[in-house]
From Swiss-Prot:
Alphabetized PANTHER family for the sequence: SPORE WALL MATURATION PROTEIN DIT1 (PTHR37285:SF5)
The protein's name: Spore wall maturation protein DIT1
Pfam families: DIT1_PvcA
Highest taxon of source: Eukaryota
Cited function: Involved in spore wall maturation. Catalyzes a two step reaction that leads to the LL-dityrosine containing precursor of the spore wall.
Segments for region (Disordered): 1-23
UniProt key word GTP-binding: no
Length: 536
């Protein structure tokens, strides 16, 4: 549940905000069934609330609740309670204060979780507001204390202290209509009109109620696939160029109806999965560097439309990163299956990710054993996709089919766990951002699917003999630039198509077309692509 509010101070009569001054979502959160039974939980599993409050009075500016807790409904009672508690300094930073509330007093705020809670608070040098979080007191250790400090420092909360602005125009609704018309990917059984739009609007109001630039996060642009039948090379090409231009255009089109506009943060998941998808860590880093270079060439001067960050950025930035001790995650084993070259820093990030944000606790293993379970469907989808993607990888060429399938199953299992953990991390770092995705979603929230390349820019085809766009309802197989390449067919239409590189190569080999691959020109911002012409 999310609140954004300017509550009356404790000196005022009212103890609850007017309905128009906060927003809340009533969706069933995925984290309400996290067990608190003495198990060694990830730090994410311990988070119950993340908030910002005034340094002058008891007002809260924003509040993100988890695990069905009730801090927002009883905010002044909660604040008065913790004011009466003694505080101490965190072991990892004297700038973080900690208070412990016993389970008997915490239950009314935690919906009777039956555990004591820790309230940690911190103020950044560049802010006046107080940042705070509430975590359960279970299996306390130095890593958990560091992770809390890191989230308090790095979570994107700086806009919370901006005041609510009264506007006659319902910009949140205009933005929802804009998103639906210009970006949203619609699938069968789409839930946008059955609760999804309402959820989207409530998330948008964190920005529109303050009349600030709307910010979205898009986990995407990891690296090129290792499968040479899908892509042509390992650096960004025309596909990435078209995708970046589409996102830039969307941010500028929104300005026409919402002047503060929009910024999209591309949160690369390349180093999350690189060793699972058969790509060396340094290849991911090179792809990312080249993507930034391409963006600089296609960006509109003076317009901050797109920002970039990745796994290493999320962990090795800010004050807390300077006091991190790798020994804290030495017990975390990250399995590698594809024989790729591993970067120590990236692997350390993966260790931190899994220790800090893995919420599996053995549930995935049980879920994929249940016929018809949604997670079993996801697991099988990952397995099919990775079976195809890694089929040509040199590391597996000596494997029997049985052994290959077994490894693929292990890879799919680990990818789901890492994907969940990364999603949890993004949720903590970007608690109020709109979450958009390159995967198909039912659009009920919290994630909303988009097509990074529009049909107007480039048609998606599975064959050059049939240029009609195929239908994609599999949540894993919405076509992306990093699993395909772009081909320009020189005829009277001069049209671009997105397809597998194998399709183009076979058409050239069969003599159906004549053409070449044009390399990416990073100096002028022109992405690489095939240029072909049909032979009469």
């Amino acid at each position: 549940m999310t609140f954004t509010s300017n509550l009356p101070s404790s000196s005022e009569q009212s103890i609850s905000p007017p309905a128009s001054s906060f927003s809340s979502s009533t969706d069933t959160l995925k984290d309400i069934d996290i067990p608190h039974n003495g198990a060694d939980l990830s730090t994410y599993s311990k988070f119950l609330a993340l908030y910002c409050r005034s340094d002058k009075c008891d007002d809260f500016y924003s509040l993100e609740e988890k695990q069905n807790c009730k801090f927002g409904d009883q905010w002044l009672d909660f604040i008065n309670t913790i004011h009466n508690l003694d505080f101490s300094e965190s072991e990892v930073s004297g700038r973080v204060s900690e208070r412990i509330l016993p389970a008997s007093l915490a239950n009314k705020f935690t919906n009777n979780l039956g555990v004591a809670i820790k309230i940690s608070e911190y103020t950044r040098d560049d802010e006046r507001q107080i940042r705070g979080c509430v975590t359960t007191v279970e299996n306390e250790n130095s890593f958990n204390n560091w992770f809390v400090y890191h989230i308090l420092d790095q979570s994107q909360l700086s806009l919370s202290e901006h005041p609510i602005v009264t506007k006659e125009v319902k910009y949140h609704e205009l933005f929802a209509d804009f998103f639906e018309k210009n970006l949203k990917n619609t699938i069968v059984n789409d839930q946008w009109n059955f609760g999804g739009r309402d959820y989207f609007i409530e998330r948008s109001r964190y920005f529109t109620d303050r009349y600030l630039r709307i910010e979205c996060i898009l986990p995407a642009f990891p690296c090129k696939s290792s499968n040479e039948q899908k892509v042509y090379g390992s650096v960004p090409d025309k596909g990435e160029e078209l995708a970046l231009k589409r996102l830039i255009k969307a941010t500028q089109d929104l300005v026409k109806i919402y002047p503060p506009g929009m910024k999209i943060w591309i949160v690369s998941d390349g180093h999350v999965f690189s060793d699972c998808i058969g790509v060396d860590d340094d290849v991911v880093s090179t792809y990312t560097t080249k993507l930034h270079e391409l963006y600089k060439r296609v960006a509109i001067p003076g317009v901050d439309a797109i920002g970039f960050c990745g796994l290493n950025d999320l962990f090795f930035s800010g004050a807390a990163s300077k006091v991190f001790d790798p020994k804290w995650v030495s017990d975390v084993e990250v399995a590698h299956y594809t024989g790729t070259q591993i970067c120590p820093k990236s692997d350390l990030s993966r260790q931190i990710l899994m220790k800090g944000c893995d919420t599996d606790a053995g549930r995935l293993r049980k879920q994929i054993a249940i016929e018809g379970h949604p997670r079993l469907h996801l697991y099988r989808g990952f397995s099919r996709f990775m079976m195809e993607d890694l089929s040509l990888l040199e590391h597996f060429q000596s494997y029997s089919r049985k052994k290959f399938k077994k490894i693929i199953s292990m890879i799919a299992f680990n990818m789901i766990k890492r994907n969940d953990a990364y999603s949890n991390l993004v949720e903590l770092i970007f608690p109020h951002h709109l979450r958009i995705s390159i995967h198909a979603h039912t659009n009920s929230g919290p994630k909303f699917g988009i097509k990074v390349i529009s049909n107007e820019q480039c048609s998606i085809v599975s064959s050059l003999e049939d240029l009609d766009e195929p239908k994609f309802e599999d949540f894993l197989h919405i076509p992306t630039p990093w699993h395909n390449c772009v081909v320009k067919v020189e005829d009277e239409k001069e049209k671009y198509f997105l397809t597998k590189s194998k399709v183009v190569k076979e058409a050239l080999e069969k003599g159906m077309y004549d053409g070449v691959w044009k390399d990416t020109r990073f100096d002028i911002g022109e992405g690489g692509h095939f240029v072909i012409k049909k032979i009469s």
